[in-house]
Amino acid sequence: MEINVNKFAPLLLGFALLLSACNDQEDQVEDRIEEQAEQSAQESGDTPVALGLTERQLLDAEILAADGTELGDVEAVTKDADGNATELLIEVEDSDPDRYVAIPIDGLTVTTRGNDTDLSSEMTMEDIGSLPDAQIL
């Protein structure tokens, strides 16, 4: 049986365009989160917002499980009316497509690895996986 590949060309092109559109939308969401986080960090300046860290330091941190496994990267900081951080928006490690969840500041501890300042949690990747997706506006 001979298959005419040309018949499928429009379908393959459509699929490729759909994938591209999904990637573009993901990139736009990520860019928007990053821009808002950077603006907020700039406004906070050198003022510690949680755990003795500035907002910029929190944004540079990775979230680690107790065993050192990377759980995700901090993408944004949610603050209360007084400017204190209450939770972190993280991009879950190795998620595809990118998945974002919010975790509370309570229960996190500062961990220094070389020149890196990260945050340790008692949560596991299974715990992170069971959290609801964060609502991103």
Identify the function of each model-found stretch:
Residues 2-14, 22-137:
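Peripheral interaction segments used for macromolecular assembly
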